[in-house]
């Protein structure tokens, strides 16, 4: 009996040991998978829903604790957009989205939310017009977690220039400089460098001279267009003060005040890159200004720093290194070289002449921008203290258009409690707007040659 057990043990032992090892490995795998399986099955948690309706486009944002996938399609008669969001279940937060639709939304009239199938929620947007939607996700950034973004753009994009002319139909006269450059474009190889227009130098007014020279539109000269760019907007609040003041709100208010003053000035008109609480990408801000053939671009901001004592106004222009980088990219882009040379369509066939004109445009932009900035700094000093007494240089993407003087104005430090209160005050906002208006007027009075040449 003992021998038989020993013999059985000898024959059966090897497979038994192998089986035991397989069982142990299987058990270990199960243990490793246990914490993962509930994670996979768990639906994402909705943290917030936000809507940003605007004439330009409406944005709907869903913020979640994990990344999701979404599919969408549109339907006609009537116009609708259907969005299927995977990895989420119906929740009170999604029902809240229904209540966030505003009656004045240009694109969305209503929406419905339902659990389409397990872990898939369907949102149906009833639309007021045909749209060209964009649906994408964003990784965590700033204070935000994962975001699913739904943008509702019009099927036919709005033209900033048409809107500007409709709202401010001042007569646009022929620009002789543009005509000269157009002639060059028609006959590039027969053009010598001596025939290129020579622009007079831009000289900043003396800092000791504080007399105000009102801008006067000369006969035959077209209306001057100023593009005002209130920073941030929509999902991007900009800097936030200790008292909860958001940069995007105060700079929009200052820009709107300045626009009203510019529009009331003969020979001038203003265009806002955003006129409400919505987000505009940096390159779109520049393209808008170029589309309306702006003669000057002013980006308006409120500064912030870790030390609450930091304060004062600042003015920035593009650094020469930044401008060189932009030029290098554009010159390397053969597709754009024929149509966009510093934003100036010259129809130039000679690449050597095109490069010279682009270099001239870039150099003139930096030179004129610095002149504007110096003038603005002097006027801001009249209404408030300066953070630094000289113009600052940096590679701001929004200042990289080579065909118009571009400056960025930091009105004050929203991180400074005293200046935060000042930025909230309507009278102080008006003072900043007046200072900028006077700076604009002084600049164009001293430099009447500066004009867009599109």
Model segments located where?
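Short, solvent-exposed loop/turn elements at domain surfaces
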Residues: 71-72, 92-93, 235-239, 417
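Flexible glycine-/small-residue-rich
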Residues: 64-66, 85-87, 127-129, 152-154, ...
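Catalytic-core regions of hydrolytic enzymes
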Residues: 184-351, 362-374, 421, 434, ...
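Signal-peptide-cleaved, periplasmic/extracellular N-terminal interaction regions immediately downstream
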Residues: 2-225
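Active-site-adjacent mobile loop/cap segments within catalytic or ligand-binding domains
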Residues: 70, 296, 306, 357-454
């Amino acid at each position: 009996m003992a021998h038989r057990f020993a013999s059985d043990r000898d024959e059966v032992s090897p497979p038994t040991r192998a089986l035991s090892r397989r069982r142990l490995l299987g058990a270990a795998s199960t243990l490793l998978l246990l914490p993962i399986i509930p994670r996979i099955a768990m639906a994402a948690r909705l943290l917030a829903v936000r809507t940003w309706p605007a004439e330009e486009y409406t944005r709907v944002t869903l913020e979640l604790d994990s990344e999701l996938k979404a599919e969408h399609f549109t339907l006609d008669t009537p116009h609708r957009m259907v969005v299927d969001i995977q990895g989420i279940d119906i929740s009170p937060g999604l029902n809240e989205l229904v209540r966030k639709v505003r009656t004045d939304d240009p694109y969305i009239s209503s929406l419905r939310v339902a659990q389409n199938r397990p872990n898939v929620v369907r949102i149906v947007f009833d639309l007021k017009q045909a749209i060209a939607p964009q649906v994408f996700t964003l990784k965590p950034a700033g204070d935000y977690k994962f975001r699913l973004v739904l943008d509702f753009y019009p099927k036919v994009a709005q033209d900033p220039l048409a809107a500007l002319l409709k709202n401010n139909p001042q007569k646009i006269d022929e620009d002789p400089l543009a005509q000269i450059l157009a002639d060059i474009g028609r006959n590039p190889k027969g053009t010598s460098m001596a025939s290129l227009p020579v622009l007079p130098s831009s000289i900043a007014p003396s800092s000791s001279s504080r007399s105000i020279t009102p801008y006067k539109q000369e006969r035959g000269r077209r209306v001057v267009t100023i593009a005002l760019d209130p920073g941030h907007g929509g999902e991007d609040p900009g800097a936030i003060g200790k008292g909860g003041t958001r940069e995007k709100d105060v700079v929009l208010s200052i820009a709107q005040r300045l626009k009203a003053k510019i529009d009331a000035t003969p020979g001038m008109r203003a265009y806002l890159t955003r006129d409400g609480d919505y987000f505009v990408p940096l390159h779109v801000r520049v393209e808008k200004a170029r589309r309306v053939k702006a003669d000057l671009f002013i980006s308006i901001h409120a500064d912030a720093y870790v030390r609450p004592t930091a304060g004062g106004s600042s003015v920035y222009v593009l650094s020469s290194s930044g401008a060189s980088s932009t030029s290098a990219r554009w010159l390397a882009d053969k597709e754009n070289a024929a149509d966009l040379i510093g934003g100036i369509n010259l129809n130039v066939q000679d690449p050597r002449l095109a490069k010279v004109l682009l270099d001239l445009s870039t150099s003139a932009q930096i030179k004129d921008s610095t002149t504007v900035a110096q003038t603005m700094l002097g006027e801001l000093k009249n209404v408030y203290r300066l953070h630094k007494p000289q113009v600052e240089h940096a590679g701001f993407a929004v200042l990289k258009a080579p065909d118009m003087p571009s400056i960025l104005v930091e009105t004050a430090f929203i991180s400074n409690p005293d200046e935060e209160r000042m930025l909230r005050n309507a009278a102080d906002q008006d003072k900043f707007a007046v200072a900028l208006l006077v700076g604009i007027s002084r600049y164009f009075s001293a430099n009447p040659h500066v004009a867009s040449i599109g």
